[in-house]
């Protein structure tokens, strides 16, 4: 085994993947390259936080679409990691090349594929919102099938699982889909071939050859155990078309929360966690009250009433774009967040006056969570996002609003650490 595994972190944000991998094994995992670009903002705050903490790697602050192939080609990364946006993955025939495909401009998944084509890493670990598996609404599962086909075309297998961090002992009910992608010429892939593949491909569809992989042998099964049977016998197999455009136009299939794609076929099961791990309650990650600044308390009656209204049930008459009226209804939720339960999913709007913001009551007073508490919900070190380094080298403080925005976009780093722990075991198996 190499003395170190070199990592390229794409869509790096403030470094969640890097924290997770380094917390697993800082001597083994070396993030030598990163890319972070916020297209909708003039200031590049997330990049500046990342660069403050990790000045020694090659940190690229430009639109990934503008990074030339030649730069990727020079990166001898063993692993690519990243959490990428959920977008429209549909493809069409290229007008310049009838045999080629063309994704919609600005869809960043295709930049991952471009990087993989140039770098040819052994492994990828990727993250996205769980609704990706059901997108788009009019052709459920199509986008994910396109992604699987793209990796298959490059000679990779893909294992996936939707993971709710709270179901594996963390302090936030955050559901995300994680992918473990591995090249088909790795020793791990060859080992899986010997164990699960059959010379008669039809057997794959008539049996449950990959059940043992999904329930026991796969990366996610080892670190995030599940009950050994599908929910309501929900399982499906599907042979992907060799034509990605055909998948884009005609895919009709099922994708459950757990699965494996190998050699152009996928097997998917709807699974449930063993629930053996107790989540950390919200109350346990709160700062000591004497350290909480008064600005986080909500004392204004109008703001208190606004929170009460937003969290309450309501029926509102609205008018559609076409002009017809309809009733928008919203169920009620508890007036404040239960400190005995793990936190809810943080959004980028955390800390503003809205329904999704955490709103807590302590000793008869109401307040929002602090930036440090937001960092703890994502398993980041305290004050990780407090400072950033500007292009002129000056270090300045980051606003609370931006710190909350960062954490709403981030991932639970302890989940990443566990994935990295198991990847290390798999790499050792490759010896």
Locate predicted features:
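Basic/polar N-terminal segments that are highly enriched at the extreme N-terminus
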Residues: 1-2, 431
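Core alpha/beta nucleotide-donor-binding catalytic domains of modification enzymes
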Residues: 2-120, 129-144
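Extracellular structured ligand-interaction cores
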Residues: 4-7, 174-178, 341-343
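Short, flexible loop/turn elements at secondary-structure junctions
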Residues: 11, 38-39, 130, 162-167, ...
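Class I S-adenosyl-L-methionine
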Residues: 70-77, 89-333
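Short loop/turn segments at secondary-structure transitions that flank enzyme active sites
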Residues: 83, 183-187, 352, 383
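C-terminal target-recognition/interaction regions appended to catalytic cores
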Residues: 251-431
